[in-house]
């Protein structure tokens, strides 16, 4: 669990924070894709993204956390969602793989973010960046994964 978890998990972030996190996720998935494809060092990718993009409305700390947290936990993240896949990990589209890793990271480490938000954000990222119908694949995987990682939240009917 991240040390940035909210003291009140039921509290909703302010609207501006929600938009800033959405932008952070969007940039993070692009940066993770670059990392997966080019293997460039994370600090170089982060510097490039911060230089090339307007971060005034981006949750920069969240972008940093995702960009560095996902690669650090890559093996654990992959083994967490791999049982939910309908094909071998090596056959997953690189964009969808970046989205699944990001979403799995949030489900595992950011319990302050409701599971429904994580799933919805993953779907929206796949609609924006993924292949045709990639959002359906991402939705299917995350729908199978959420009960395994957020069982108490689902049972409680929260969020």
From Swiss-Prot:
Taken from the UniProt entry, a GO cellular component term is: cytosol
Q: Which controlled-vocabulary keywords does the entry list? A: RNA-binding, Transcription, Transcription antitermination, Transcription regulation
What the entry lists under SUPFAM superfamilies is as follows: NusB-like (SSF48013)
- Any single biological process term in GO: transcription antitermination
Segments of this protein annotated with the region Disordered: 1-21
Q: Which domain of life is it from?
A: Bacteria
Q: Name one Pfam family in it.
A: NusB
Q: Which CDD domains match?
A: Terminator_NusB (cd00619)
InterPro entries, from UniProt?
NusB-like_sf, NusB_fam, NusB_RsmB_TIM44
Does the keyword section mention Lyase? no
Has the keyword RNA-binding been applied to this entry?
Answer: yes
* Gene Ontology MF term list: RNA binding
- Similarity comment: Belongs to the NusB family.
Job description of the protein: Involved in transcription antitermination. Required for transcription of ribosomal RNA (rRNA) genes. Binds specifically to the boxA antiterminator sequence of the ribosomal RNA (rrn) operons.
Question: Which NCBIfam families does the annotation name?
Answer: nusB
Q: What is this protein called?
A: Transcription antitermination protein NusB
Q: Which gene encodes it?
A: nusB
